[in-house]
């Protein structure tokens, strides 16, 4: 049996649609977001994968994405573990604000630093490094042991929590990871060798 991990960023949320900084705020999925999650579940079912356990954040947009995927895979009864360790990066004082209005107030350059710097956080928020400092230890302690037992694991989470995880999994540096974008609702499938190194990476496109 292969050691397999599937990562997926939640489908489009109501605040993605409104161009708002979301972070730890908890809007639901749009109809498009639900459609993205359902399509991802159908694609994953076509691969023949069966999950042994699933993880998601404490936020409903990720939870609903996971639930829609599991329904399509006829695994609705699978244990779904919810943890704030996998939450999106906390955008602090920017949370709930319109991104264009934030740029007008603080300037494009400052907003770009907050969004894409690895170490600099927005006021009262988290940097990507801060996000990784909670995501990676949780992965090592709770999730990786399942993979090392040749189980197949789903993580439905968020753009920045997944970027932090991918950075650690793939050994990327801060410059490499800040340039990576994760589309909503697109599964990334990793398989691993017995020493936890990556054997393969596949992006399942619609």
From Swiss-Prot:
One of its GO terms (biological process) is glycolytic process. Pathway: Carbohydrate degradation; glycolysis; pyruvate from D-glyceraldehyde 3-phosphate: step 3/5. Substrate binds at residues 9-16, 22-23, 61, 88-91, 99, 115-116, 159-160. CDD domains: HP_PGM_like. HAMAP family: PGAM_GpmA (MF_01039). Homodimer. This is 2,3-bisphosphoglycerate-dependent phosphoglycerate mutase. It comes from Bartonella henselae (strain ATCC 49882 / DSM 28221 / CCUG 30454 / Houston 1) (Rochalimaea henselae).
């Amino acid at each position: 049996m292969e050691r397999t991990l599937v990562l997926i960023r939640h489908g489009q949320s109501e605040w993605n649609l409104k161009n708002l900084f979301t972070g730890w705020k908890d809007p639901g999925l749009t109809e498009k977001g639900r459609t993205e999650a359902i399509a991802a579940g159908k694609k994953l079912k076509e691969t023949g994968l069966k999950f042994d356990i699933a993880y998601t954040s404490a936020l409903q947009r990720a939870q609903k994405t996971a639930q829609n995927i599991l329904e399509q895979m006829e695994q609705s009864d699978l244990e779904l573990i919810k943890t704030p360790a996998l939450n999106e990066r906390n955008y602090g004082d920017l949370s709930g604000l319109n991104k264009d209005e934030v740029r007008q107030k603080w300037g494009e350059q400052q907003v770009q630093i907050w969004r894409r710097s690895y170490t600099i956080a927005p006021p009262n928020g988290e940097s990507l490094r801060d996000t990784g400092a909670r995501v990676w230890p949780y992965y090592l302690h709770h999730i990786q042991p399942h993979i090392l037992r040749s189980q197949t694991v789903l993580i439905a989470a968020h753009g920045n929590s997944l970027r932090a995880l991918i950075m650690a999994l793939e050994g990327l540096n801060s410059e490499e990871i800040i340039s990576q974008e994760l589309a909503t609702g697109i599964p990334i499938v990793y398989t691993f060798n017995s020493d936890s190194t990556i054997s393969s990476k596949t992006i399942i496109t619609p």
